[in-house]
From Swiss-Prot:
GO cellular component: extracellular region
Signal peptide region: 1-27
Name by which UniProt lists this protein: Prokineticin-2
Linked pathology: Hypogonadotropic hypogonadism 4 with or without anosmia: A disorder characterized by absent or incomplete sexual maturation by the age of 18 years, in conjunction with low levels of circulating gonadotropins and testosterone and no other abnormalities of the hypothalamic-pituitary axis. In some cases, it is associated with non-reproductive phenotypes, such as anosmia, cleft palate, and sensorineural hearing loss. Anosmia or hyposmia is related to the absence or hypoplasia of the olfactory bulbs and tracts.
Induction and repression of expression: Activated by CLOCK and BMAL1 heterodimers and light; inhibited by period genes (PER1, PER2 and PER3) and cryptochrome genes (CRY1 and CRY2).
Protein family (similarity comment): Belongs to the AVIT (prokineticin) family.
Subcellular location: Secreted
Disulfide pattern: C34-C46, C40-C58, C45-C107, C68-C115, C109-C125
Keyword annotations of the record: Biological rhythms, Disease variant, Disulfide bond, Hypogonadotropic hypogonadism, Kallmann syndrome, Neuropeptide, Secreted, Signal
Major subcellular site: secreted
PANTHER family: PROKINETICIN, PROKINETICIN-2
Keyword Nucleus in record: no
Amino acid sequence: MRSLCCAPLLLLLLLPPLLLTPRAGDAAVITGACDKDSQCGGGMCCAVSIWVKSIRICTPMGKLGDSCHPLTRKNNFGNGRQERRKRKRSKRKKEVPFFGRRMHHTCPCLPGLACLRTSFNRFICLAQK
C-alpha cells in the first residue's frame, strides 16, 4: 500500500528529466577539428581541445596579453650535451606550422610576441625585447 502512495511522487521526479533529454540521433558537431597546423587557417594552430583531450582543434595563436605555454619546461644545468641540444633546437623554427603533435591546448604567440614568465607559473604573450 505504501508503494502506491509513493508512485505519483516518483513519477513527478522522473518525468521532467525524460522530457528534457534530447531525441536519439542528436549529437554534438565539433567544427575546426584537425590533425596538423597546415589544416588550420592563418593565425591558428592545431592544439589539444581543452574539454576532450583526444580531439585536436584549430585554436587562435596568442595575442598580446593572452596566457601561453612555454615551449619547454626542461631545466638547463649547463652541461655540454644540453648546451649542444639547446643550440640545435634554437636553429629549428618554433613557429606555425609545427609538423609534430602539440601536447598542450594553447598555441604559440603571434610573430613579434614572446611567451614570457610573469610569475612563478604564469606565462603571457608580451612584445619581444
